[in-house]
Amino acid sequence: MADRLTQLQDAVNSLADQFCNAIGVLQQCGPPASFSNIQTAINKDQPANPTEEYAQLFAALIARTAKDIDVLIDSLPSEESTAALQAASLYKLEEENHEAATCLEDVVYRGDMLLEKIQSALADIAQSQLKTRSGSHSQSLPDS
């Protein structure tokens, strides 16, 4: 997961891409401009141009990305936070970190204990299999 500034930069880059794509598609699909001194014959019976659909699509994409940018900006730390507030926040984070470390150490210890039990059980199983195999081999050998 990226930090907030990286997310914000990615969102701004995405918004710039959307603007460029919107301009390019609208330029490509847009109707020709009419000039007063040039006569052009345009067929009025042409099928509807998909420009309107593209305009709505890009408007929705741009609006959604702009909202995402607003949310990311609002989530950034404010300039109003004082050193005391930052220190308190850091202290709280350190406490949570120590609690998580203690919990992790406990889980690792219990995991090690379970691993030892499993290894001991596997060793017992292997020994008993070896004993049964060696016992069956000695019984199958003829006595001379």
Swiss-Prot record:
Gene Ontology biological-process annotations: regulation of transcription by RNA polymerase II
GO cellular component annotations of the record: mediator complex
InterPro entries: Med7/Med21-like, Mediator_Med21
Keyword line: Activator, Nucleus, Transcription, Transcription regulation
Entries under Pfam families matching the protein: Med21
Localization, UniProt: Nucleus
GO molecular function (one): transcription coregulator activity
Similarity field: Belongs to the Mediator complex subunit 21 family.
Function: Component of the Mediator complex, a coactivator involved in the regulated transcription of nearly all RNA polymerase II-dependent genes. Mediator functions as a bridge to convey information from gene-specific regulatory proteins to the basal RNA polymerase II transcription machinery. Mediator is recruited to promoters by direct interactions with regulatory proteins and serves as a scaffold for the assembly of a functional preinitiation complex with RNA polymerase II and the general transcription factors.
Subunit description: Component of the Mediator complex, which is composed of MED1, MED4, MED6, MED7, MED8, MED9, MED10, MED11, MED12, MED13, MED13L, MED14, MED15, MED16, MED17, MED18, MED19, MED20, MED21, MED22, MED23, MED24, MED25, MED26, MED27, MED29, MED30, MED31, CCNC, CDK8 and CDC2L6/CDK11. The MED12, MED13, CCNC and CDK8 subunits form a distinct module termed the CDK8 module. Mediator containing the CDK8 module is less active than Mediator lacking this module in supporting transcriptional activation.
Annotated protein name in UniProt: Mediator of RNA polymerase II transcription subunit 21
Organism annotation: Macaca fascicularis
